Amino acid sequence: MRPMTHVPVLYQEALDLLAVRPGGVYVDATLGGAGHARGILERGGRVIGLDQDPEAVARAKGLHLPGLTVVQGNFRHLKRHLAALGVERVDGILADLGVSSFHLDDPSRGFSYQKEGPLDMRMGLEGPTAKEVVNRLPLEALARLLRELGEEPQAYRIARAIVAAREKAPIETTTQLAEIVRKAVGFRRAGHPARKTFQALRIYVNDELNALKEFLEQAAEVLAPRGRLVVIAFHSLEDRVVKRFLRESGLKVLTKKPLVPSEKEAAQNPRARSAKLRAAEKEAP
C-alpha cells in the first residue's frame, strides 16, 4: 500500500462546526484517508466511516483506530448502512465531496488528466467506465453531458473532437483524451483545458449529483436533535445542491456564507482552493 498522503481540507473548521462531544456517534460519509475521522476520534467521538472504494476501506481498516467502524458503501444508502449496524440516530455527519488524493495520484484509477492510465473514473469499481462513456455516447448526449456536468463552454467542439477521434480508434487512456481536448480548444489561462471534461465524466460515471441529493435527504432524517451536518463541496454544481437543500430542509443553517480555505491552506494544499464548507443543525422539537 502507498503511504497516506491525503490532506483533509478545512480540517479545523469542519471539526469545530461538527461540535463533537465525547461519546457521541458521528458519520464520516466520505472516509477516504480517515483524516477527518481521526479528528472526531481525538475529540472523544465514535465514528462510522463510509467509503464506496474497496481500496480506501482496506486502508482504513488497516489503521486499527479504536472507535472507528468502517463500512464499504455509497453514502446515498446512508440509512441502509446505519440500519445494518442497528443505528437509528447520529450526533453529526460530515461529508468531504472532493476527489481523494489517492484517486488523483493513482494513474490506474483514471481520474487524472496529467498522468497516463486507463479511462476508468469509477469510485466504487462498479458500473460503466469513462472509457465506455466517451466511446459510446452519441454526439448530442456527449455535448450535453460536458455542458451540464462540466459547465464547459466549448462542450460541442470537444464532443465533436471526441467522436472524430473514436471513429479512427477507441479512446483508451486519460492522456489520450486530455490531448484530444487540448487540440480541440487550445490552452487556457485558468487551468488545464481538459479539467472540466474530466469533471463532467467523473460526475456522470459515479452519478454524483443524484447520490448527493439522496444522501442529504437521509442525513437530515437520521440526525438526532441538535445533531449537525457539515458538507465540503468542491465545485459549483455540488455547492448549489447543498445550498438549496439546506435552505429547504428545515435545518438551522450555521453558515450564512460558506467557509473557504485560508490563503495559507490554499497555498499549502492547492486542491483545497475551490472548497466551500456549509453546515446546519437539526433543531430540538
Swiss-Prot record:
Localization (cell): Cytoplasm
Chief location of this protein within or outside the cell: cytoplasm
Enzymatic reactions: cytidine(1402) in 16S rRNA + S-adenosyl-L-methionine = N(4)-methylcytidine(1402) in 16S rRNA + S-adenosyl-L-homocysteine + H(+)
UniProt-annotated binding residues for S-adenosyl-L-methionine: 34-36, 51, 75, 96, 103
Entry EC number(s): 2.1.1.199
Pfam family, one: Methyltransf_5
This protein's record includes keyword rRNA processing: yes
Protein name, entry field: Ribosomal RNA small subunit methyltransferase H
UniProt organism field: Thermus thermophilus (strain ATCC BAA-163 / DSM 7039 / HB27)
